[in-house]
Amino acid sequence: MSVSRIYIANVSYSSSEEDLREFLKDFNFSSVLIPCHTVRRFRRNEARSFGIAYVDFTSSEEAVRAVEELNGKEFGGRVLRVRTHNPYQPPKPIKERFGTKLQQLKKFAKYEDTAASGERAPTDAQDHPDQPQEGHMSPDVVLVNGTTDEEQQLANVINDPVTNADAPGTEQNISKEKAISEDTVYCAFLPKETTDNDLRNYFTDYGSREIWIFRTKNVSNSRFRFRNRNHTAALVTLSTELPLNKVIEELLGKKLLGTKISIKPAYIYKINEVKKIAEQSHMLATEYRHQNGNSDVVIGTPNEALLNSTQVASQIIGSNPEIEVSNQNSSSIANVAETNGNVGDTPITKLDSRNNIKIVNIGNPQDKTKKNQPNDNKELNKIDLETKNDSLHLESICDPIISIDMSGMTKQSVGSNKKKNKKKKSARGKEVRKLSVSNTTTQ
């Protein structure tokens, strides 16, 4: 395409079109244009040049000669940059570049038909042999002549869409991720205080076999205030024979704790991810260990925690002959064997995050003395302990394993730990508090 217009850059702002015509008097040009824009001032407006110019010549040969002679030449105190003008072409619409959706489907269908017939799908280079092939690769693996039978068999396995179904990006793999459960729904935008009992009551007409509730953590960054909220969601497995679409349609508009919620069919791969995370969390909680002196305390399942919790209680309370520890889920009673020594300097914190007990050492327990020690043959139902500083606090997380009656303990303030070798102050004016530990269940 022949172009008879040139583009001149770095033109002086003080140069006019008449000055440029005088500069180009040795060439056969037809028009000179210096584009400008209006600068608005307080009292009047001014026209300011863009620093460029366009010159039209009588022929393309004359334009080429002007570019060769004028490029790099000085005009108005500036060195000019001259080149041929490139006409502006707007970008093509997306439909023209890639075709409509129907054209794309037909193009891919052509590859599928040729692959099913055993022939190699035509490429763009085969359709247009004059154009070089750029950025296109055939989906098949083609081996050159002289290959062995094993290599050819390997190529057939790679090309086989059935054996290569698990490859990432294939339709089979994508369909697995988008598979929807037939009995589990995903409930979003639940109230913060939602419990499993609330969800059971909500789905009482359809039955709930399994419920998974999970919550997101708050974002403390003030720049993202829209994320600073508690998002609670749940996966509920229903036992009804109705299809999920029918269940969702019937529950449309029904509120949970006065709040509208969103119910959708759950993806199967999301259900598997939640169950996998729950299993890993349970294993970590089971294997959690806390070192206390020379012994390791392991809190496992609720049945194992009953025996382990007695060892923990014996280490914390000190040298006491026996304490009744009850499991309220069963009638079994475990006795704590006599142990010597006190708790170490490291406070005992949460031992199990889900299933069992939480033991907290508020300070360094002082020496404890027994009152009214019973005979060995007499069953011990209650132990009174005296302490002058701090106390012991055992708290049940879910089903209580250790039962403690704190009603016998008077009000006290938790202060800083005192050194063990510090002399005891006189008991004048000091209140001696009693800690009553009793069993709330009877055997």
From Swiss-Prot:
Biased amino acid composition, Basic and acidic residues: 121-133
GO CC annotation:
cytoplasm; nucleus; ribonucleoprotein complex
Q: Where is the composition biased (Basic residues)?
A: 417-427
Q: Does the keyword Repeat apply?
A: yes
Domain RRM intervals: 4-87, 183-268
* Keywords annotated in UniProt: Repeat, RNA-binding, Transcription, Transcription regulation
Return the InterPro entries for the record.
Nucleotide-bd_a/b_plait_sf, RBD_domain_sf, RRM_dom, RRM_dom_euk, Rrt5_RRM1, Rrt5_RRM2, RRT5_SRSF_SR
Q: Which PROSITE patterns match?
A: RRM (PS50102)
- One GO molecular-function entry: mRNA binding
Q: Name one Pfam family in it.
A: RRM_1
Q: Where is this region: Disordered?
A: 112-140, 408-443
What function does the entry list? May be involved in the modulation of rDNA transcription.
Write out the similarity annotation: Belongs to the RRT5 family.
Name recorded for this polypeptide: Regulator of rDNA transcription protein 5
Species of origin reads Candida glabrata (strain ATCC 2001 / BCRC 20586 / JCM 3761 / NBRC 0622 / NRRL Y-65 / CBS 138)
- Tell me the gene name: RRT5
